[in-house]
Amino acid sequence: NRLSVPINEPDVFKLGSLTGFGETFAAKVMGKYLDKYPEKKVSIYMGESDDLLVQLANGRIQACIVDTYCPPEEYECHELFESETICICAPTHPLAGKTVDFKELNPYRLIFREEGSKSYLNLRSILHGYNQDIHNFASFVEVGTINTIHNLVIENVGLSFVYKFVVQKKLDRGVMSQIFINDFKNKTFINYVWMKNSFFAEKNREFLDICKHYLSSLGDLNL
């Protein structure tokens, strides 16, 4: 049990984050955190939610941003916001900006994270909820990172399902487009969590306060 921190240990805030959010939301909030606490040292570990919770339990990180349910008897959990899952494509894709039925996506190539990843399991769950499956699509590309998915979509290799918040800037710049699907709506809670009774609870709340302040500054922005 980690009941104390060695006196000579640097004051490092060790945060874990979902890969996509680590490059967008967490990076922005961390900048504001360091503006308020310039003496702090920071380490950010990025990965899938299930991996982050393992790292949290092992003590490699002291808090994390995840998109999964965390039992209250084990974790201190705070909802940050709901993130919408959308279908994205290149601006030159035949369906870019259009509203279609789900089955109209089937003639195209689907791009997704590797089988076994939480992203893959989430995608499969979403598709099954609309009587669809990965194998309904004409073909697919399975990749290892979120950035690779984004790059392949931009190159018009295929379409993908991602959190809107993660690609909002690319949508705003016009390097990606959204495909609107009739009767499709999927939102997921994004949570900031740490272990129950953690020694680092006070420091974790400092970052939580920055998160809340940043989110309030966004107003009613649809994440």
Give residue spans per PLM region.
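Short beta-strand->loop
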Residues: E76-I86, R173-N186
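Flexible hinge/capping segments at coil-to-helix
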Residues: I7, E74-I111, E115
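Short beta-strand-centered segments that line the small-molecule binding cleft or hinge
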Residues: K28, K32, D50-T85, C89, ...
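Alpha-helical "hinge/linker" immediately C-terminal to small N-terminal DNA-binding modules
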Residues: N1-I7, H213-S216
